[in-house]
From Swiss-Prot:
Participates in the reverse transport of cholesterol from tissues to the liver for excretion by promoting cholesterol efflux from tissues and by acting as a cofactor for the lecithin cholesterol acyltransferase (LCAT). As part of the SPAP complex, activates spermatozoa motility. Pfam families: Apolipoprotein (PF01442). Its main location: secreted. This is Apolipoprotein A-I. It is found in: Secreted. Residues 67-266 are annotated as: 10 X approximate tandem repeats. It comes from Phoca vitulina (Harbor seal). GO terms for molecular function: cholesterol transfer activity; phosphatidylcholine-sterol O-acyltransferase activator activity; phospholipid binding; protein homodimerization activity. The modification Methionine sulfoxide is found at residue 109. Glycosylated. Homodimer. Interacts with APOA1BP and CLU. Component of a sperm activating protein complex (SPAP), consisting of APOA1, an immunoglobulin heavy chain, an immunoglobulin light chain and albumin. Interacts with NDRG1. Interacts with SCGB3A2. Interacts with NAXE and YJEFN3.
Length: 266
Protein backbone atom coordinates (compact mmCIF):
# COMPACT_ATOMS: atom_id res chain seq x y z
CA UNK A 1 0.00 0.00 0.00
CA UNK A 2 2.83 2.38 0.82
CA UNK A 3 4.46 1.73 -2.53
CA UNK A 4 1.17 2.42 -4.30
CA UNK A 5 0.68 5.74 -2.49
CA UNK A 6 4.22 6.88 -3.24
CA UNK A 7 4.08 5.74 -6.87
CA UNK A 8 0.83 7.62 -7.51
CA UNK A 9 2.13 10.74 -5.81
CA UNK A 10 5.42 10.75 -7.72
CA UNK A 11 3.86 9.93 -11.07
CA UNK A 12 1.23 12.63 -10.63
CA UNK A 13 3.67 15.26 -9.46
CA UNK A 14 6.05 14.51 -12.32
CA UNK A 15 3.20 14.29 -14.79
CA UNK A 16 3.57 17.90 -15.88
CA UNK A 17 7.22 17.29 -16.81
CA UNK A 18 6.49 14.02 -18.60
CA UNK A 19 3.63 15.64 -20.48
CA UNK A 20 6.09 18.19 -21.88
CA UNK A 21 8.65 15.47 -22.67
CA UNK A 22 8.82 16.38 -26.36
CA UNK A 23 8.13 20.09 -25.84
CA UNK A 24 10.07 23.13 -24.74
CA UNK A 25 7.15 24.78 -22.90
CA UNK A 26 7.34 25.51 -19.19
CA UNK A 27 5.39 22.69 -17.46
CA UNK A 28 2.38 23.43 -15.30
CA UNK A 29 2.44 22.74 -11.60
CA UNK A 30 0.29 19.78 -10.45
CA UNK A 31 -2.17 22.13 -8.76
CA UNK A 32 -2.50 24.31 -11.86
CA UNK A 33 -3.17 21.23 -13.97
CA UNK A 34 -5.80 19.87 -11.58
CA UNK A 35 -7.40 23.29 -11.19
CA UNK A 36 -7.62 23.84 -14.95
CA UNK A 37 -9.14 20.42 -15.58
CA UNK A 38 -11.62 20.75 -12.73
CA UNK A 39 -12.63 24.26 -13.78
CA UNK A 40 -13.22 23.23 -17.39
CA UNK A 41 -15.21 20.16 -16.33
CA UNK A 42 -17.37 22.01 -13.81
CA UNK A 43 -18.02 24.89 -16.22
CA UNK A 44 -19.05 22.51 -19.01
CA UNK A 45 -21.38 20.57 -16.72
CA UNK A 46 -22.79 23.78 -15.23
CA UNK A 47 -23.41 25.51 -18.55
CA UNK A 48 -24.76 22.38 -20.21
CA UNK A 49 -27.05 21.63 -17.27
CA UNK A 50 -28.38 25.18 -17.20
CA UNK A 51 -29.22 24.98 -20.90
CA UNK A 52 -31.24 21.81 -20.33
CA UNK A 53 -33.05 23.36 -17.38
CA UNK A 54 -33.87 26.48 -19.41
CA UNK A 55 -35.19 24.37 -22.29
CA UNK A 56 -37.39 22.37 -19.92
CA UNK A 57 -38.83 25.48 -18.24
CA UNK A 58 -39.61 26.96 -21.66
CA UNK A 59 -41.55 23.83 -22.67
CA UNK A 60 -45.30 23.49 -22.18
CA UNK A 61 -44.85 20.98 -19.35
CA UNK A 62 -42.27 23.18 -17.63
CA UNK A 63 -44.57 26.20 -17.75
CA UNK A 64 -47.44 24.13 -16.40
CA UNK A 65 -45.42 22.73 -13.49
CA UNK A 66 -43.75 26.10 -12.74
CA UNK A 67 -40.98 24.49 -10.67
CA UNK A 68 -38.65 27.51 -10.93
CA UNK A 69 -35.77 25.18 -11.67
CA UNK A 70 -33.67 27.91 -13.27
CA UNK A 71 -33.68 30.00 -10.09
CA UNK A 72 -32.72 26.94 -8.05
CA UNK A 73 -29.97 26.06 -10.55
CA UNK A 74 -28.46 29.53 -10.33
CA UNK A 75 -28.53 29.35 -6.52
CA UNK A 76 -26.82 25.96 -6.64
CA UNK A 77 -24.16 27.26 -9.05
CA UNK A 78 -23.47 30.19 -6.72
CA UNK A 79 -23.11 27.83 -3.75
CA UNK A 80 -20.71 25.53 -5.63
CA UNK A 81 -18.63 28.53 -6.76
CA UNK A 82 -18.35 29.65 -3.14
CA UNK A 83 -17.21 26.16 -2.14
CA UNK A 84 -14.50 26.20 -4.80
CA UNK A 85 -13.21 29.53 -3.49
CA UNK A 86 -13.08 28.22 0.09
CA UNK A 87 -11.39 24.90 -0.68
CA UNK A 88 -8.92 26.33 -3.23
CA UNK A 89 -6.29 27.57 -0.73
CA UNK A 90 -6.56 24.37 1.34
CA UNK A 91 -5.98 22.15 -1.68
CA UNK A 92 -3.12 24.39 -2.82
CA UNK A 93 -1.44 23.91 0.55
CA UNK A 94 -1.85 20.13 0.27
CA UNK A 95 -0.15 19.98 -3.14
CA UNK A 96 2.61 22.35 -2.03
CA UNK A 97 3.42 20.09 0.93
CA UNK A 98 3.36 16.95 -1.19
CA UNK A 99 5.61 18.54 -3.81
CA UNK A 100 8.08 19.56 -1.14
CA UNK A 101 8.22 16.07 0.37
CA UNK A 102 8.89 14.34 -2.98
CA UNK A 103 11.21 16.98 -4.44
CA UNK A 104 14.38 14.84 -4.40
CA UNK A 105 12.76 11.82 -6.01
CA UNK A 106 11.07 13.96 -8.66
CA UNK A 107 14.37 15.64 -9.51
CA UNK A 108 15.98 12.25 -10.08
CA UNK A 109 13.12 11.11 -12.29
CA UNK A 110 13.18 14.35 -14.28
CA UNK A 111 16.91 13.85 -14.78
CA UNK A 112 16.15 10.40 -16.23
CA UNK A 113 13.53 11.92 -18.52
CA UNK A 114 15.94 14.53 -19.83
CA UNK A 115 18.61 11.90 -20.45
CA UNK A 116 16.23 9.72 -22.44
CA UNK A 117 14.94 12.77 -24.30
CA UNK A 118 18.45 13.63 -25.50
CA UNK A 119 18.95 10.06 -26.73
CA UNK A 120 15.70 9.85 -28.69
CA UNK A 121 15.74 13.39 -30.10
CA UNK A 122 17.81 12.38 -33.18
CA UNK A 123 15.23 9.72 -34.04
CA UNK A 124 12.44 12.27 -33.73
CA UNK A 125 14.30 14.76 -35.91
CA UNK A 126 14.93 12.07 -38.51
CA UNK A 127 11.26 11.07 -38.49
CA UNK A 128 10.15 14.69 -38.91
CA UNK A 129 12.56 15.18 -41.79
CA UNK A 130 11.38 12.04 -43.58
CA UNK A 131 7.76 13.00 -43.07
CA UNK A 132 8.33 16.43 -44.59
CA UNK A 133 10.04 14.77 -47.56
CA UNK A 134 7.08 12.43 -48.07
CA UNK A 135 4.58 15.28 -47.91
CA UNK A 136 6.60 17.35 -50.36
CA UNK A 137 6.87 14.37 -52.73
CA UNK A 138 3.10 13.86 -52.52
CA UNK A 139 2.49 17.56 -53.17
CA UNK A 140 4.69 17.45 -56.27
CA UNK A 141 2.82 14.43 -57.62
CA UNK A 142 -0.58 15.97 -56.95
CA UNK A 143 0.18 19.46 -58.31
CA UNK A 144 -0.08 18.50 -62.03
CA UNK A 145 -3.37 16.73 -61.37
CA UNK A 146 -4.79 19.86 -59.78
CA UNK A 147 -3.78 21.93 -62.79
CA UNK A 148 -5.34 19.31 -65.05
CA UNK A 149 -8.61 19.55 -63.14
CA UNK A 150 -8.70 23.33 -63.36
CA UNK A 151 -8.14 23.19 -67.10
CA UNK A 152 -10.52 20.30 -67.77
CA UNK A 153 -14.24 19.87 -67.56
CA UNK A 154 -16.30 18.69 -64.59
CA UNK A 155 -16.46 15.12 -65.89
CA UNK A 156 -12.72 14.83 -65.26
CA UNK A 157 -13.31 14.98 -61.51
CA UNK A 158 -13.90 11.22 -61.30
CA UNK A 159 -10.74 10.59 -63.30
CA UNK A 160 -8.78 12.85 -60.95
CA UNK A 161 -10.11 11.00 -57.91
CA UNK A 162 -9.00 7.70 -59.41
CA UNK A 163 -5.50 9.10 -59.93
CA UNK A 164 -5.32 10.58 -56.42
CA UNK A 165 -6.42 7.40 -54.66
CA UNK A 166 -3.23 5.38 -55.23
CA UNK A 167 -1.09 8.41 -54.37
CA UNK A 168 -2.90 8.83 -51.06
CA UNK A 169 -2.52 5.13 -50.28
CA UNK A 170 1.17 5.33 -51.13
CA UNK A 171 1.66 8.27 -48.76
CA UNK A 172 -0.25 6.44 -46.02
CA UNK A 173 1.82 3.27 -46.44
CA UNK A 174 5.12 5.14 -46.46
CA UNK A 175 4.10 7.14 -43.39
CA UNK A 176 3.12 3.92 -41.61
CA UNK A 177 6.55 2.50 -42.39
CA UNK A 178 8.27 5.53 -40.85
CA UNK A 179 6.01 5.40 -37.77
CA UNK A 180 6.73 1.70 -37.25
CA UNK A 181 10.45 2.35 -37.58
CA UNK A 182 10.28 5.20 -35.07
CA UNK A 183 8.28 3.04 -32.63
CA UNK A 184 10.91 0.29 -32.87
CA UNK A 185 13.72 2.80 -32.28
CA UNK A 186 12.04 4.33 -29.22
CA UNK A 187 10.90 1.07 -27.61
CA UNK A 188 14.22 0.33 -25.83
CA UNK A 189 14.30 3.83 -24.32
CA UNK A 190 10.71 3.57 -23.07
CA UNK A 191 11.57 0.26 -21.43
CA UNK A 192 14.75 1.76 -19.98
CA UNK A 193 12.77 4.62 -18.46
CA UNK A 194 10.23 2.21 -16.96
CA UNK A 195 13.01 0.08 -15.47
CA UNK A 196 14.69 3.12 -13.93
CA UNK A 197 11.48 4.16 -12.21
CA UNK A 198 10.93 0.63 -10.91
CA UNK A 199 14.55 0.50 -9.70
CA UNK A 200 14.26 3.78 -7.81
CA UNK A 201 11.07 2.68 -6.07
CA UNK A 202 12.61 -0.72 -5.29
CA UNK A 203 15.67 0.99 -3.80
CA UNK A 204 13.40 2.98 -1.53
CA UNK A 205 11.70 -0.21 -0.30
CA UNK A 206 14.99 -2.05 0.22
CA UNK A 207 16.57 0.82 2.10
CA UNK A 208 15.01 -0.32 5.34
CA UNK A 209 11.64 1.10 4.32
CA UNK A 210 12.33 4.24 6.37
CA UNK A 211 12.10 6.70 3.48
CA UNK A 212 9.04 5.03 2.01
CA UNK A 213 7.34 4.92 5.40
CA UNK A 214 8.15 8.58 5.91
CA UNK A 215 6.64 9.52 2.53
CA UNK A 216 3.51 7.52 3.32
CA UNK A 217 3.15 9.01 6.80
CA UNK A 218 3.56 12.57 5.52
CA UNK A 219 1.11 11.99 2.67
CA UNK A 220 -1.45 10.59 5.13
CA UNK A 221 -0.85 13.54 7.42
CA UNK A 222 -1.43 16.03 4.60
CA UNK A 223 -4.60 14.20 3.52
CA UNK A 224 -5.95 14.29 7.08
CA UNK A 225 -5.20 18.00 7.32
CA UNK A 226 -6.92 18.61 3.98
CA UNK A 227 -9.98 16.67 5.16
CA UNK A 228 -10.22 18.65 8.41
CA UNK A 229 -9.77 22.03 6.74
CA UNK A 230 -12.35 21.21 4.07
CA UNK A 231 -15.05 20.28 6.60
CA UNK A 232 -16.30 23.86 7.18
CA UNK A 233 -16.55 24.53 3.45
CA UNK A 234 -18.43 21.27 2.87
CA UNK A 235 -20.78 22.10 5.74
CA UNK A 236 -21.41 25.51 4.17
CA UNK A 237 -22.22 23.74 0.91
CA UNK A 238 -24.69 21.45 2.70
CA UNK A 239 -26.35 24.40 4.42
CA UNK A 240 -26.51 26.30 1.14
CA UNK A 241 -28.11 23.36 -0.64
CA UNK A 242 -30.87 22.89 1.93
CA UNK A 243 -32.93 25.97 0.88
CA UNK A 244 -32.49 25.07 -2.79
CA UNK A 245 -33.64 21.48 -2.26
CA UNK A 246 -36.50 22.55 0.00
CA UNK A 247 -37.66 25.12 -2.56
CA UNK A 248 -37.56 22.52 -5.31
CA UNK A 249 -39.42 20.01 -3.12
CA UNK A 250 -42.14 22.55 -2.28
CA UNK A 251 -42.55 23.57 -5.93
CA UNK A 252 -42.75 19.94 -7.03
CA UNK A 253 -45.34 19.05 -4.37
CA UNK A 254 -47.41 22.10 -5.30
CA UNK A 255 -47.28 21.13 -8.97
CA UNK A 256 -48.32 17.55 -8.21
CA UNK A 257 -51.14 18.78 -5.96
CA UNK A 258 -52.38 21.15 -8.65
CA UNK A 259 -52.30 18.40 -11.27
CA UNK A 260 -54.21 16.06 -8.93
CA UNK A 261 -56.92 18.68 -8.34
CA UNK A 262 -57.34 19.20 -12.09
CA UNK A 263 -57.68 15.45 -12.66
CA UNK A 264 -60.26 15.11 -9.88
CA UNK A 265 -62.26 18.04 -11.24
CA UNK A 266 -62.61 16.43 -14.68
Amino acid sequence: MKAVVLTLAVLFLTGSQARHFWQQDEPQSPWDRVKDLATVYVDVVKDGGRDYVAQFEASALGKQLNLKLLDNWDSLSSTVAKLREQIGPVTQEFWDNLEKETEVLRQEMNKDLEEVKKKVQPYLDEFQSKWHEEVELYRQKVAPLGAELREGARQKLQELQEKLSPLGEELRDRARTHVDALRAQLAPYSEQLRERLAARLQALKEGGGATLTEYHAKASEHLSALREKAKPALEDLRQGLMPVLESFRASLLAAVDEATKKLNAQ
